[in-house]
UniProtKB/Swiss-Prot annotation:
InterPro entries xrefs: RBP11, RBP11-like, RBP11-like_dimer, RNA_pol_Rpb11_13-16kDa_CS, Rpo11-like
Gene: POLR2J3
Keyword field contains Nucleus: yes
Protein name as it appears in the record: DNA-directed RNA polymerase II subunit RPB11-b2
Matches recorded under PANTHER family: DNA-DIRECTED RNA POLYMERASE I,II,III, DNA-DIRECTED RNA POLYMERASE II SUBUNIT RPB11
Role summary: DNA-dependent RNA polymerase catalyzes the transcription of DNA into RNA using the four ribonucleoside triphosphates as substrates. Component of RNA polymerase II which synthesizes mRNA precursors and many functional non-coding RNAs. Pol II is the central component of the basal RNA polymerase II transcription machinery. It is composed of mobile elements that move relative to each other. RPB11 is part of the core element with the central large cleft.
Source organism of this protein record: Homo sapiens
A Gene Ontology biological process term: transcription by RNA polymerase II
């Protein structure tokens, strides 16, 4: 069969998680390739990027169902770098998800479902 080995969907070596390439087709844009991820992460990062008023375009694609990577394209205003927008989006997501986890744990404490 032509399917890749199962371990390829999650095994990742040092320094292979993300690559950043400048997009030469449009000004002030970058392509972020994130390995071993899928639509779940791509959509949440894209949505967070679009909340930033200095981001002109944010989109993602999965090149092929058998390739375990996503490509996120980000274009920003001239005074704001795509790398800075991406870093800010990730930082904001970490904060939001930490708050969600904290509130979830607070709701579960009265039910004694947590150790």
């Amino acid at each position: 069969m032509n399917a890749p080995p199962a371990f390829e969907s999650f095994l990742l070596f040092e320094g292979e998680k993300i690559t950043i390439n400048k997009d030469t087709k449009v000004p002030n844009a970058c392509l972020f390739t994130i390995n071993k991820e899928d639509h779940t992460l791509g959509n949440i990062i894209k949505s967070q990027l679009l909340k930033d008023p200095q981001v002109l375009f944010a989109g993602y694609k999965v090149p092929h169902p058998l390739e375990h990577k996503i490509i996120i394209r980000v274009q920003t205003t001239p005074d704001y770098s795509p790398q800075e927008a991406f870093t800010n989006a990730i930082t904001d997501l970490i904060s939001e998800l930490s708050l969600l986890e904290e509130r979830f744990r607070t709701c579960l404490l009265p039910l004694r479902l947590l150790p």
